[in-house]
């Protein structure tokens, strides 16, 4: 067994050290299991793998609650073993996505800031309690009086709330995670109504909690050594389209500063997950903007590049999700990066209250947008789940400025990312200020629906599809008598229908 004695500072806790197999045996059919992790960072690995192995001879089903997406040791292993009955609140795993879209796993797509409190409120489907929390740690501290402090690793996610709410806690002490991570975290769980108070954070750099998750030792059912690394993913190359979107964003920001709608160092930035979002942030590295602040959920390569360039003052998030190369860079210089980074529970990092208070600039990606400014972030052709809404809604409705990015084309030009009407709506026209593509910037603030349509078709849509979109809009205006939001109901989803039938949205 892996030696974790130097990581466990509480002598009484050492008596609870056991194998992954013994810990997995504690999990029973029908349980609600809350795990640490947010993106493939800071999630338990040994116990889920042992549970998947056990299920080969002892089948069972669990309801799996996470922070967001997690690594393959959970989502692939448990899905392929038939263990997952229900899953929430976000995922990016191919095996799990297939199971969701064929109906074998029931999936609840939630705003990420809502998850922990919904569990505490008893709003979840079926049985409401967290039966067992499985949390990855780099250190277990002795707080005295039968209390320990769980020092998380590369993410916070919902760990603080899971530990507080769970009947039992399993801790995986991962020796591949550096002990130097201690001090980066800020664990805080808000009170629930009717006793809720304002979250006492007014700047991205504020610390309002503890550097560990407090836990009663009597709750800890098992402590499991682990030496499996985070399965972080490589990000896509920054292509010409991504560079163009980044340049368009920087030009827009410069105009906003010139018009005195933004300060010279902008406002706290929030950026979604993925290659496009990372590429857009990377566009700021070579810009003139300095003394930037970040209040986001996921800290990707672009954020580290801003730190390295001396342009970032503080970076607040709930998870580190760098590429493998960037993770190595971080691990070799943890002490320096710690000066800039704060990891918080997603209930705080994604808090709508805080997004509005500090004036976040929300920047997220879209699968498609329609001519009136509605955004689809989650479904292909309105039916097949891609990933989930994630934290985009937490920030979009409550930020100072809300920006969505999309390339004008997808699938080699077979799909227009601008359509007459979104096949699924995650963010309504009321929540969208600006849409950016490689072609330009559509500033929708203060415009009527018909004005928005003209700007989006002109600035965002690809010339290949502009004639079709203009034709639809003009005929809709005539057919509806120039009404507030013109649509031809029999044709509103015609682009999608044509793609499903012919493989292209072109006529």
Stretch-by-stretch model annotation:
Residues 2-507:
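Conserved alpha/beta enzyme-core scaffold
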């Amino acid at each position: 067994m892996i030696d974790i004695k130097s990581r466990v500072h509480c002598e009484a806790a050492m008596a609870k050290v056991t194998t992954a197999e013994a810990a997995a045996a504690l999990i029973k059919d029908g349980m609600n299991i809350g795990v640490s992790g947010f993106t493939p960072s800071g999630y338990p690995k040994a116990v889920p793998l042992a549970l998947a192995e056990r299920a080969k001879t002892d089948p069972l089903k669990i309801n799996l609650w996470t922070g967001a997406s997690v690594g393959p040791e959970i989502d692939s292993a448990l899905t392929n073993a038939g263990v997952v009955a229900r899953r929430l609140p976000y995922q990016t795993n191919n095996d799990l996505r297939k199971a969701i879209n064929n109906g074998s796993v029931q999936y609840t797509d939630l705003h990420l800031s809502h998850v922990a409190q919904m569990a505490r409120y008893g709003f979840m489907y079926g049985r409401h309690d967290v039966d067992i929390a499985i949390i990855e740690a780099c250190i277990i501290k002795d707080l005295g009086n039968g209390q320990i402090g769980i020092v998380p690793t590369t993410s916070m996610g919902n760990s603080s709330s899971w530990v507080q709410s769970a009947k039992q806690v399993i801790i995986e002490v991962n020796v591949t995670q550096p002990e130097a991570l201690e001090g980066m975290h800020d664990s805080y769980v808000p009170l629930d109504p009717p006793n809720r108070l304002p979250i006492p954070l007014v700047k991205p750099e504020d610390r309002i909690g503890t550097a560990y998750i407090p836990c009663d030792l009597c709750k800890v059912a098992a402590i499991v050594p682990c030496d499996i690394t985070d399965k972080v993913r490589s990000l896509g190359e920054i292509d010409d389209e991504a560079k163009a979107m980044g340049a368009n964003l920087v030009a827009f920001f410069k105009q906003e500063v010139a018009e005195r709608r933004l300060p010279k160092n902008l406002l706290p930035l929030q950026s979604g997950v993925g290659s496009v979002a990372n590429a857009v942030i990377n566009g700021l590295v070579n810009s003139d903007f300095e003394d930037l602040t970040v209040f986001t959920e996921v800290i990707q390569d672009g954020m580290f590049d801003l730190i390295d360039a001396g342009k970032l003052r503080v970076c607040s998030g709930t998870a580190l999700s760098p590429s493998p190369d960037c993770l190595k860079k971080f691990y070799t210089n943890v002490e320096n990066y710690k000066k800039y980074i704060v990891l918080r529970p997603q209930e705080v990092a994604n808090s709508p209250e805080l997004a509005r208070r500090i004036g976040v600039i929300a920047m997220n990606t879209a699968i498609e947008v329609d001519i009136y400014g509605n955004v689809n972030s989650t479904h292909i052709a309105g039916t097949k789940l891609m990933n989930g809404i994630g934290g985009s809604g937490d920030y979009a409705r409550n930020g100072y400025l809300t920006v969505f990015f999309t390339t004008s084309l997808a699938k080699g030009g077979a799909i227009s990312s601008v359509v007459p009407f979104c096949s699924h709506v995650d963010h309504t026209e009321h929540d969208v200020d600006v849409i950016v593509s490689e072609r330009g910037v559509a500033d929708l603030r203060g415009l009527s629906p018909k004005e928005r349509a003209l700007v989006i078709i002109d600035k965002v849509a690809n010339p290949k599809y502009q004639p079709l979109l203009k034709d639809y809009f003009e005929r809709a205006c005539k057919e509806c008598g120039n009404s507030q939001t013109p649509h031809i109901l029999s044709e509103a989803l015609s682009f999608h229908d044509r793609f499903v039938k012919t493989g292209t949205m072109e006529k």
